[in-house]
Amino acid sequence: MSRVKKATKADNGKATPTIQLPIDVNFILALDLSLNATGYCRHRLDSGETDYGVIESNGKRGIERLDAIVGRVRGLLGEDPGAGKPVCKLSTLVVIENYAFAKANQAHQIGELHGVVRYELWKQGLPYLLIAPMQNKKWITGQGNSDKNLVLKELMKRYGFDVNDDNIADAIGLMTLTKAVLGKWEHPLVAFQKEVVSKVLEATAS
């Protein structure tokens, strides 16, 4: 069963991670949260089925925009409106690309978006994993400071996903990285991939 633990203080004085990786993951939802175009990727480990796309804000602003994005995330988790519970609740892991503020005047708005999405996951009892943007880029390209064009190119070359939207590309990168972290990646890892996986595992170690 998926496990979530509270943050505590480790012997070295640093806070330990707020989650432990679930032991029975079968469904990954990866999110590259954005105010205008949130990239997502869903993957079932048992069947290999994958889909991806973009959650667009469609001109909405403020609370209305936050509510619309959270609603779409809820839908992507397979929630049955009648039962009010996600179909895959006990086997789901959500992975989110952590904060990266491109525009200073949007920092608080992006923070609000991350907050309401994480609150929704908390309400549903779903664990989530945070991946730094530079870790995700390094996983995809081998370089943590890669531009969007290189990310798109290397995603096709290394992982076989031909997309033309960088938000979707980031979400697919998160999904494939999470598979590797869970030990479910089907191919041998090269040195830089091993390094990224090791860093993520260190951050989630109990």
PLM feature spans:
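Phosphate- and other anionic-substrate recognition elements at nucleic-acid/protein interfaces
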Residues: M1-S206
